[in-house]
């Protein structure tokens, strides 16, 4: 079976309520030097991604677009391994000066951390309680 690596509308957080759900119910947080990732288990059939790049954090539009593009592309390639998560990615101040290669590396580490946290959570949620 061929794995799909598309970034269709089904894998995007689209409305404010989707984003608010992640902010309010974030069970997983991953801090990287230039990114913050928030995630919660998804109620959908696949992982979804939302990227927030505030003008206050990244002044130039082409830099905001570059950051969003890198985050989306990295997610697209890792979405099959992440399990069912709704994820919001937010850059930190100073990200404009970082090279694409460094950002790719930070994104790789973040996906790995999220994957480990989600697996640990699933084991705890599935394991029978000892009463």
UniProtKB/Swiss-Prot annotation:
Sorted UniProt keywords: Endonuclease, Hydrolase, Nuclease, RNA-binding, tRNA processing
Alphabetical list of Gene3D superfamilies matching this protein: 3.30.230.10
Documented EC number(s): 3.1.26.5
GO MF, one annotated term: 3'-tRNA processing endoribonuclease activity
Gene Ontology terms: cellular component: ribonuclease P complex
Short name of any one Pfam family annotated for the protein: Ribonuclease_P
Catalytic activity entry: Endonucleolytic cleavage of RNA, removing 5'-extranucleotides from tRNA precursor
GO biological process: tRNA 5'-leader removal
Hydrolase as UniProt keyword: yes
Assembly notes: Consists of a catalytic RNA component (M1 or rnpB) and a protein subunit.
NCBIfam families: rnpA (TIGR00188)
Function summary: RNaseP catalyzes the removal of the 5'-leader sequence from pre-tRNA to produce the mature 5'-terminus. It can also cleave other RNA substrates such as 4.5S RNA. The protein component plays an auxiliary but essential role in vivo by binding to the 5'-leader sequence and broadening the substrate specificity of the ribozyme.
HAMAP family: RNase_P
Family: Belongs to the RnpA family.
Name used for this protein in its record: Ribonuclease P protein component
Organism, scientific name: Acinetobacter baylyi (strain ATCC 33305 / BD413 / ADP1)
Gene this protein is translated from: rnpA
């Amino acid at each position: 079976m061929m794995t799909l690596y598309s970034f269709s509308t089904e894998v995007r957080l689209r409305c404010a309520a989707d984003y608010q759900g992640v902010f309010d119910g974030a069970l997983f947080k991953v801090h990287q030097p230039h990114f913050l990732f928030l995630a919660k288990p998804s109620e959908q059939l696949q992982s979804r991604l939302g990227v927030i790049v505030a003008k206050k954090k990244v002044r130039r539009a082409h830099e905001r677009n570059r950051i969003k593009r890198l985050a989306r592309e990295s997610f697209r390639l890792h979405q099959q391994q992440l399990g069912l998560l709704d994820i919001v990615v937010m850059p930190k101040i100073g990200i404009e000066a970082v090279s694409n290669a460094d950002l790719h590396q930070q994104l790789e580490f973040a996906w790995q951390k999220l994957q480990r946290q989600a697996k640990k959570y699933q084991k705890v949620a599935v394991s029978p309680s000892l009463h």
